Structure formats: structure tokens, C-alpha cells
Amino acid sequence: MKKATSILLLLALVATLACALVACNPADEEWYVEDGAEVINVYLRDFEEWSNNYTIDAIRRFNSNLTDGIQVEYTLLLADQYENKVQSDREAGKAPDVYLISYGNLLTAINYNYILPLENVLSQKMIDDISESAKDYVYLKEHLYAAPFCFEPSIMLFYSKKAFATAGVTSAPKTYAEMLDACAKIKPTLSKAQYVVGTPKGLPMGWANIGQFYNAAGGNLPLSDDWSESLVMQNKEGYTSFLNYYTSLYTKGYTPLQDCAGGYNEIIREVCEGRAAMTFAGSYAVSTIYDEYPECVDDIEVAVVPTMDGTSNVATTTNGGWSYVLDAATAKRKGADGRTHAELAAKFLEFLLTDSEVAPEYFEKANYCKSAGYNSVIAATGKEGEGNKYYAEIARAASNAIATPLYNYDITTECSKMIEEMVINGKSADQVITTFDNMVKQIIRQSGLAGKNPAYRGN
């Protein structure tokens, strides 16, 4: 049985308005409750509406087994509240059994012993099913610490063919110069209520642009592979070119200073609803186009983001995404039958992430703009994705993408601060790069990062 769409939409709406939806059991007969079952608490993070609905329905389907002794209850939290809620509940001794962590934040959770190694709780079948590429993200310090959920290029360029044609722009810009030239042509054709290009603001300004900074620096992150020294000044020329180009989008009035409604997760709506001619967005924007704006599919195209020299078969984005983890305390929490919460939660994760009917459905609903971390799910969804008009370009970006860095997120925050300082405070690229270099050195020193990269294998 499938839950009525209206009920699922109502659940998502209530969650958004209330900021958290705790153990929500709809009144109809389709929400299953097993009397006497051990409750496993899951914290869900607010994503796209279709994604929230999928996960809530998957929980409902898992709970339809009224003999396994497991009852999954969830709390749906807004994105900007998620990490603080997990942290505060952990400190209060009320951490959820299961929650989501982005791949770039796994190492911090491991270092603080927040999460449980999974080798002894997940089934061997599920462990063997993890794809080779996904293993690089979830195996750290010689242990499996997370169950991969999805992978997705963090930034692509989506654009309206109609808006481009009106302005005489014949193709997607490949270089910084072409991008600025296209913006200059498009701006005079727009009304006062429209703007040229959407860009990530706030926190996403950092993580969404990691790949662009990496590309500008000639394929280098801001610090050495062993995390012992800053590489910022070695790559000053590339950073300067990127920063001057990117901040021009603001200073020339091509992108607004304020964020759009819904933030970076929903920024594709700006193009779909005619407020912007193009936008940077994660690959997941494809699903919003297909599901909510099918009339825009013919008009909106996608391309790899511009690079300094126009080379597109290189890394321009991170393969971002999310994994499910078990709180360390789940190994000690036990139900009446003696099974630990870790054992019970593992049953749910296996169902959610690898069940032959449930898991592929997520990527179908995503319109194949994301990739799975399990061989069985990849095999079940790969061919269908080739019929998606956006699939080839997104797959190209994903194949060249880098993993989200494992070092302190403070460094990524400092990257976005360079942009902010130039746009808001009028500082030069030279000034902000010098400050960035000093901050990277300070973070390396204060956090003791030198030699601590778990992925470093030597020269």
C-alpha cells in the first residue's frame, strides 16, 4: 500500500512550519505501530520535498513489519537547525540512534568518538555491496563508520535557453571571460524583477564552491596532502583569477546579495519561475525541474561550471552527499529482548539503503541526478538514468569530481570569507588571499592537523 500523496505533503508541511516533526504517526490505518516494539529514533534533515516524502514513506513501509520488534520514529529538522540539534541532544544524553552526516564531516565525528564503527552491526551482505568508489568516503581510520546514502555534484550551471537566445548568447559559457560576457549581454534584456545568475549564499557559498577553488588552484586544495602546510600562496595566481571573476558577478549586479527563498537547495526555482536567467545549483536541482516544473524541461539546460581556460573535463565540483551513522551510545542501549539499538538500527539502514524495491525508488524519484553507494542499487538504476536529458553532463562532472575534503570545515568557511570580504568590504584579492593563507596556517597549528589526514598514503 502507498500512503496518499496529500498526507505525505501535509506531513512535510507541518515539519517545515514546526521546525521539527517528532514521531509523527498519521491518523489513518496506513501508519503502522507495533505494540511493545523497541523504538529507534532517527533524525532526518530537511531536503527537497520529494526527498522528505520518500524517506517518511520508507519509514512507514519498514514499520509495516509488525513482528520484528522495531518501531522507527523520526524527527524532521530544518537544515540550518540540524547539526545544532544533534549536538545539543548528544550533550544532554539524548542523541538519536540514527542521523545523517555529510561525508566531509565524518572525520570530526570519528575523532570525537560520536559515532559507532559499523563492521559488527551491518550485515556482511550490505557491507560487501558498498561500491569501491563509496568506500573511499566511509572507510576512515581502518573502520567503516557510515552507511553511504547518496552522492551528487555540488555545483553545476543551469540556464534557460530562451533567456540566452533573447540576449544573443549561443552556448553555455566555458570560461570566466565568457561567463562575464554572457552576463553583460543578458542583463539589459531583463526586467527590474529579474536577475542574471543565482549563486550560493551563506554556508553553501563555502562547500558548493570547493571544486571551483580547487580547479582555480590547478588541482590543489588549500593545504598539502598530509595537512602539514598551507599551499595558498603557491596557488595565488589561480585564486586571484577566480576571485576577481566570481566577485564580479556581485559587483556588476549580475547576482543579488541576498539569498533566494529556500536557499541553495531550492535555487533552481529562480530559473524555473523566470526570476533568473541561469543559476549555479547542485545536481539535485534536476529532480525539482522534472517533478515540479515539467514545462521547463525543454528550456533549461545544464553545463559544467566555467573554468579559467575553458577546460571542462577536469574537477570543478565536489561529489557531495550524505551518509547515515549510528550514535556511539547505540551499542549500550538495549531493548527488552537484549538486542542493542545498534543492531536494531542496522536492520532499518539495510532496508532503507539496499532493499531491492525501496532503495532504487529514491534515485528514480531523484530523476537520476544522484548516484547510489551500493552496487546492487547502481545496477538497478544505471540504465534508466541514461534516458534523462541531464544525465550525461552530470555524470561527466561527477566522474571528474573530488571528494569533499576531510579537514576542518573552518578552512572551507575561510574560502567563502574571501568572497564576502571582497564583495562587502571592498578588499582586494591580494588582501583576502594573504589573510586566507594566515588562517590556514593558524588552523593547521591550532588543530594539530599536520600528518593527520587519514587518506594520506605518502608520496
Q: What do the PLM-derived regions correspond to, one by one?
A:
Residues 6, 18-108, 126-127, 309-311, ...:
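Conserved N-terminal structural module of periplasmic/extracytoplasmic solute-binding proteins
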Residues 24, 300-305, 362-421, 449-459:
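Long, aromatic- and glycine/proline-rich binding clefts that accommodate carbohydrate-like moieties
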Residues 61-132, 137-139, 162-174, 270, ...:
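Extracytoplasmic "Venus flytrap"/periplasmic binding protein-like
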Residues 140-149, 155, 180-231, 247, ...:
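Extracytoplasmic/periplasmic solute-binding protein
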Residues 89, 94-97, 126-164, 311-319, ...:
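A structural signal for short loop-to-beta-strand junctions that line the ligand-binding cleft
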Residues 167, 251-252, 291-367, 399:
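Extracytoplasmic/periplasmic substrate-recognition and gating elements
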Residues 183-184, 228-261:
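Glycine-centered hinge/linker elements that transmit conformational signals in sensory
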Residues 101-155, 180, 191, 209, ...:
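Hinge/lid segment of periplasmic solute-binding proteins
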